[in-house]
């Protein structure tokens, strides 16, 4: 009997070694060293140029306004299972968060995600804020809910919660 070979389509997903802790696609890999140096050079110039940095600060101001105007904010991607889980949790407890779907913002989505990473240190979605305070992602939000701390945080903002 010939030895069995695994094709990629039959290979278990876990065997691919893909990280499932985030909903961010991996960064592209550059094949040639000179391309990597050029990309770093362009990134450095872009981050130091005034139009980009003023655009970034405008986006940062926009994020801060959104957080100030809404007691519960979720930065999400519509296709992300972790984002779906967090949105379903808030729905179960009867809370309507202000949801911003980064994947539906066109070119501004990835830029906004970079601004969020600068502000929070978290590069993945969902990015959950309560009362303007960053509480983390899906795992953090679910843990707070299980410990009863999520309901406490929401009640401090005069938000009624169904105990589900």
From Swiss-Prot:
Localization, UniProt: Cytoplasm
Entry annotated with the keyword tRNA processing: no
KW Coiled coil (keyword) present: no
Family classification: Belongs to the glutaredoxin family. CPYC subfamily.
GO biological process: cellular response to oxidative stress
Residue positions binding [2Fe-2S] cluster: 80
Protein name: Monothiol glutaredoxin-S10
Its biological purpose: May only reduce GSH-thiol disulfides, but not protein disulfides.
């Amino acid at each position: 009997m010939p030895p069995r070979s695994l094709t990629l389509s039959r290979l278990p997903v876990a065997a691919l070694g893909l990280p499932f802790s985030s909903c961010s696609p991996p960064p592209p890999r550059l094949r040639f060293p000179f391309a990597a140096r050029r990309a770093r050079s362009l990134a450095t110039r872009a981050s130091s140029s005034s139009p980009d940095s003023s655009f970034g600060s405008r986006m940062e101001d926009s994020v801060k306004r959104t957080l100030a105007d809404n007691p519960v904010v979720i930065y999400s991607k519509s296709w992300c299972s972790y984002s779906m889980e967090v949105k379903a949790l808030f729905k179960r407890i009867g809370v309507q968060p202000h949801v911003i779907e980064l994947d539906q913002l066109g070119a501004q989505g990835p830029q906004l995600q970079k601004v969020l990473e600068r502000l929070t240190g978290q590069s993945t979605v969902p990015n959950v804020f309560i009362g303007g305070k960053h509480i983390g992602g899906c795992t953090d939000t679910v843990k707070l809910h299980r410990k009863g701390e999520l309901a406490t945080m929401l009640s401090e903002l005069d938000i009624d919660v169904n105990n589900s």
